[in-house]
């Protein structure tokens, strides 16, 4: 009963918080955020069809390879349509009465446009002509450096171990951490982009989680304009992914390509970085570990599935006496397909796993972490059961 009362209290607090947010529209402009996200979705949706025609004319087409899941040639370059949606939505945000204040006090959103143009351009070249890994990596470093140069960087880091608490990063540490995390997230999304709708869906889910977390930050910091950038960046990315997804879900009419997957990764990195920087311990207290760690946990949510897949792949290939980076058809999504899941079900299962971590981290700003943990545990059990159902059916058949 005590747990039920606590959960009811949390829900009441959340509901009253939402009402307060609508009442304080000047501090937390939910309607403007929704309009910006909708704009990104609409522009991306209609631009994707045009980009598909352009990709076919330029012969930027993904032909099926032995390790691929798709069986028909499919145009790439979807990232161009996504960037156009982002560009239009950010421009709209800069013209709206409340959100425009975020452009005055922060360069986060312009930084995303410039860095996004760099990484989308690199991706488009790769989608059409192909680039070696080193050149692509150099492009990723360049785009991440643009973010840092324009002021998007981790400035503080909360370490809950050994009584360290919050540490203020010096310039060198800030640059190195931001570059490392940005490039890691970019490659994580790129790595996981192996099934129709997977990268776009993961981008949508994680961006929504960051947006919810950012709205909570705005509430707790009395509408501080320093928290406008993560809210705008994440809602724009969510809208762009949502607009692209109808074209990309199984069976995909177009792939986002490296231009899209790297753009998604870059924007997720920028959103989590801008959310982490100005968090005040005065709003949460040093004991509220989960609220202070949530920006970093959101990064973990983005990288959880692809990094687990990458580590398992490296171990598997080394044990087999092959190069750690040699391609194969034993990735997590390949294995889920092999045990009997359909293409769509595999994508939905991975959505669930990432969503549990992402929304679990974001919800700590609204709910008691203990209650959040209990709900997450239940979700993990249910999703785990759904994941292994085909194996259980096989055993029953034997």
From Swiss-Prot:
Residues the UniProt record annotates as site (Important in orienting the substrate): 126-127
Tagged with keyword Transmembrane helix: yes
Molecular-function GO terms, alphabetical: glycosyltransferase activity; magnesium ion binding; manganese ion binding; phosphotransferase activity, for other substituted phosphate groups
One GO BP: cell wall macromolecule biosynthetic process
Chief site of localization: membrane
CDD domains xrefs: GT_WecA_like (cd06853)
Domain of life of the source: Bacteria
Cofactor(s) listed: Mg(2+); Mn(2+)
Record's miscellaneous remark: Mycobacteria use decaprenyl phosphate (C50-P) as a lipid carrier in all known cell wall biosynthetic pathways, rather than the usual undecaprenyl phosphate (C55-P) usually used in Gram-negative bacteria.
The name this protein goes by in its record: Decaprenyl-phosphate N-acetylglucosaminephosphotransferase
Source organism: Mycobacterium leprae (strain TN)
Name of the encoding gene: wecA
């Amino acid at each position: 009963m005590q747990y039920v009362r606590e959960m009811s209290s949390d829900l009441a607090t959340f509901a009253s918080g939402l009402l307060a947010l609508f009442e304080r529209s000047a501090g937390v402009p939910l309607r403007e955020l929704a309009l910006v996200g909708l704009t990104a979705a609409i522009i991306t949706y209609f631009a994707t069809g045009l980009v598909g025609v352009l990709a076919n004319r330029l012969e930027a087409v993904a032909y099926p390879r032995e390790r691929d899941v798709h069986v028909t040639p499919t145009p790439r370059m979807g990232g161009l349509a996504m960037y156009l949606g982002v560009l239009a939505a950010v421009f709209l945000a800069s013209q709206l009465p409340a959100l425009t204040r975020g452009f005055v006090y922060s360069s986060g959103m312009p930084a995303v446009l410039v860095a996004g143009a760099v990484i989308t351009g690199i991706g488009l070249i790769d989608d059409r002509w192909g680039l070696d890994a080193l050149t692509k990596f150099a492009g990723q470093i360049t785009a991440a450096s643009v973010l840092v140069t324009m002021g998007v960087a981790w400035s503080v880091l909360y370490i809950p171990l050994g009584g360290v608490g919050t540490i203020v990063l010096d310039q060198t540490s800030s640059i190195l951490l931001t570059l490392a995390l940005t490039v890691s997230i970019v490659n994580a999304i790129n790595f996981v982009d192996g099934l129709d709708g997977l990268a776009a869906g993961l981008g949508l889910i994680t961006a929504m989680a960051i947006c919810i977390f950012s709205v909570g930050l705005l509430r707790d910091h009395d509408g501080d304009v320093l928290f406008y950038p993560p809210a705008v960046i994440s809602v724009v990315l969510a809208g762009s992914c949502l607009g692209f997804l109808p074209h990309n879900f199984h069976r995909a009419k177009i792939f986002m390509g490296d231009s899209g997957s790297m753009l998604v990764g870059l924007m997720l990195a920028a959103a989590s970085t801008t959310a982490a920087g100005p968090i005040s311990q005065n709003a949460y207290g040093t004991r509220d570990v989960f609220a202070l760690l949530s920006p970093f946990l959101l990064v973990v949510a983005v990288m959880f599935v692809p990094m687990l897949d990458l580590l398992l792949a490296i171990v598997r290939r080394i044990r087999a006496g092959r190069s750690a980076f040699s391609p194969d058809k034993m990735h997590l999504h390949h294995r889920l397909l092999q045990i009997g899941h359909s293409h769509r079900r595999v994508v939905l299962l991975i959505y669930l796993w990432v969503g549990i971590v992402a929304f679990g981290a974001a919800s700590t700003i609204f709910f008691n972490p203990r209650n959040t943990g209990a709900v997450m545990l239940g979700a993990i059990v249910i999703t785990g059961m759904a994941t292994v159902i085909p194996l259980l059916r096989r055993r029953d058949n034997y």
